[in-house]
Amino acid sequence: MSEFVIETQHLYKRFGQVTALEDINIKIRQGEFIAIMGASGSGKTTLMNILTGLDTASEGKIILDGVDAAQLDEIGRQRFRAEKIGLVFQQFHLIPYLTALENVMLAQHYHSVIDEAAAKAVLEQVGLGHRIDHRPSQLSGGEQQRVCIARALVKIGRAHV
């Protein structure tokens, strides 16, 4: 197991003639909280997409929990993401016909470990224990976001983005 959950070395991302990321070097330890800040169009989303395996870098090295991401094909990146990284997107991606509890348990499905008690516990942690049987349309935007956070936390992953 690596000292760093996420590490980049001389990371670059180019879109044609446009350099979106230039010489990015970061090291993030497990349990560490960081903020990626910058103006609109500064590359924050591009960086997050690369760090989570949703995109690839033009050059440089990305080491995710000791694994060189460049050595992973698309299937390998998908598997790594499913097993190691909890994601909370700007768009919530909740299944509208599932309850809050079922949406959280969906993350467990990919690990073949369904633990309703754990799903209820993380919903309690994010302050939604009383809303577990509500569908997304019955929740406020903030509550929907907390369901997504619970869905990310219930996974066994080492990084939550």
Map each language-model feature to its residues:
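ABC family nucleotide-binding domain
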Residues: E3-R158
